[in-house]
Amino acid sequence: MANNKKMKKTTRSNLLMFGFVIIFWAVIQLISLTGHMTSKLNGLLIPVCAYIVMAISLNLVVGFLGELSLGHAAFMSAGAFAGIFFYTTAGQMLPKAAAVLIAFLLGGAAAGIFGILVGVPVLRLSGDYLAIVTLASGEILKNVLSALYVGKDSAGIHISLKDQFSLGLAPDGKMLIKGAMGILGIQKFSNFTVGIVLILITLAYVLNLMNSRAGRAITAIRDDEIAARATGLNLTHYKLLAFVSAAVFAGFAGVLYALNYSSLVADKFDYNLSINVLVMVVLGGMGNIFGGMIAAILLTILPEMLRGFSQYRMFIYSIVLIVMMLFNQAPALVAWRQRLVSKVKGEDRNAEKKVETADASYFEEMKNKSSEETGNEESVKEEK
């Protein structure tokens, strides 16, 4: 019965997260329909969705696996460049919906492959060493993409890491990737509903994974790696599963993010982006998916909302970060939050107590009945 109650609590929590995302979508639609949508808010919707997906996916590695990764922006850039490269070339010959869908799939696949290439050697490390290597891999990919020149002419596709003149393009040739300038002339596809659908897919995958046998193995590795190894768990397999899954969804987020702009440059995906996403996860609570989502929304919108307060923007931003950290970590505030949640869920707890009382009464009645039957049997034996 305890397991059933725990399962019901988990299901209720998961449904609340899905409900929050749907309500968020409905509120934005209502704002848009009533004509209160500002250009600033409209421009933030897709980045908010992308960062929510990034925070949820990084939580797999940092929160549930317990490993510090500082290269999450690299997976985002791998997905963005792979997906947008297809979208701006072969995608032009397809219906837009099909081109966007294939761009997402290719972006996720590219990020997953890069995640495997990085994860297989790197996940043998841990702690600071893992953080340093993932950070370095992200910077390496950023520099490679910044030096990448790709062109196309009647002879085919030409690639160079030197400059565009070394491509040897014919007069009818066209530059596809211009080094540090990246990919230009992207036909923007900014669809908030697509972003919400991606969040729901990410949530569904991560929650199902963490409630599965593989998810329990991942958290067991986080809690005690030595004990997990002693039980016969394949640590490399489960670590790689979490790492590559996070990379794939970061790739999806990269495609979503890149489709919101008319150009794509590698410098957007530097180590600062990885740190920002990590801050979202830490402030929301490591292993707390809902908290990470809230932190992603606040930390994406807040800096833009404070641009009018140029002199005090960083001060206010810092205060908000400190308050969020205290709210999540300070023992007194944690206890207050738990009491508040207990009051909100008071009816559910009373119902559970009634069930427990009924169960206890039932078992006590059965126990008394059994004792009476035993006493009667002993009386019969004595008479005989």
Regions found by a protein language model. Name each.
Residues 2-384:
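Transmembrane alpha-helices and adjacent helix-loop boundaries
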